[in-house]
Amino acid sequence: MYRGLINSFKNTSKFSTSLFNNNNNCSTTTKSFTHISQQLRKVHLMADKEKVFKFAGIQLLCGDNKEENVQNAIKHIDEAAKNGAKLISLPECFNSPYSTSTFEKYSETEDGETVKKLSEAAKRNQIFLVGGSIPEIDKATGKIYNTCFIFNDKGEVVKKHRKIHLFDIDVPNKIRFKESETLTPGDSFSVVDIGYCKIGVAICYDIRFPELAMLYSKMGAKFLIYPGAFNMVTGPAHWELLQRGRAVDNQVFVAAISPARNPSSTYQAWGHSTIVNSWGTILATTDEHQSIIYSDIDLNTLNETRSSIPIYSQKRDDLYKLDSIKKQ
């Protein structure tokens, strides 16, 4: 794209240099440089445009029927893609109830029907897909994980993120939930290059650990995506706060995509899926109902944030350091 313009610029420069030796040709020289300047401006505008893409977060209503849950997800993926989204995320546990008593019943292997359907949707729509999460059972070990499958625009699984930090909490008189009663924690990082930029994927409770977000940023991720299902206690208190905190801490985009609230479910999701930019500004959000949120992800604004407040060049590596023990 750039080579032809660069060669044109070189040729015109040589031509113009000779013209400078002839005062009668100054006007011709000026016109030549004006033309090249206009062409280079077009290149810069095209480059900037390439740094902008549309993201969609799908807040799905999830029930007890796995097949209906998956069909609902596919329908909304198709809708989001039709509306121009190039990167789409589903919520945590979108194909099953969020309950330790049902994870085993709803679990699938990585070549199961849910993954196949998501793969087909990503390929058909030519989009990158962060596949929320599903209960995944490992064929070899029989262990169950809370897993997010990530697909490229050819429908290929390019990464799977197994939830690293299991949601084990006990808030007196409010809520008790222990994923570790059924699930096994993952032990790997999930950073994927989608062409526009690198994204880092983690699940729900993972967002409470700033070290993970910092490591993802260190690995080059400029957009962190968290399929999550905060509840009616932690949601109002921390959902938005944590997203804006991770965004500002690392000067990245952050999206947290929740299931819609199901009044008949034993676990009540907070909803309020949200997209935040690198300045901590909310770009899009919603309420507790099923919906799709959209936002243009403009990487130019991220670069502006980092230029204005250059925390990366101001870190004191002589005093402290963050590194991963296990490499990606």
UniProtKB/Swiss-Prot annotation:
SUPFAM superfamilies: Carbon-nitrogen hydrolase (SSF56317)
Transmembrane segments: none
Pfam families on file: CN_hydrolase
Residue ranges annotated for the CN hydrolase domain, each copy included: 53-299
InterPro entries: C-N_Hydrolase, C-N_Hydrolase_sf, Nit1/2_C-N_Hydrolase, UPF0012_CS
PROSITE patterns: CN_HYDROLASE, UPF0012
GO molecular function, one term: omega-amidase activity
Keyword match Hydrolase: yes
GO BP terms: asparagine metabolic process; glutamine metabolic process; oxaloacetate metabolic process
CDD domains tied to this protein: nit
Name of the molecule in the record: Nitrilase homolog 2
Organism per entry: Dictyostelium discoideum (Social amoeba)
Lineage, broadest ranks: Eukaryota, Amoebozoa, Evosea, Eumycetozoa, Dictyostelia
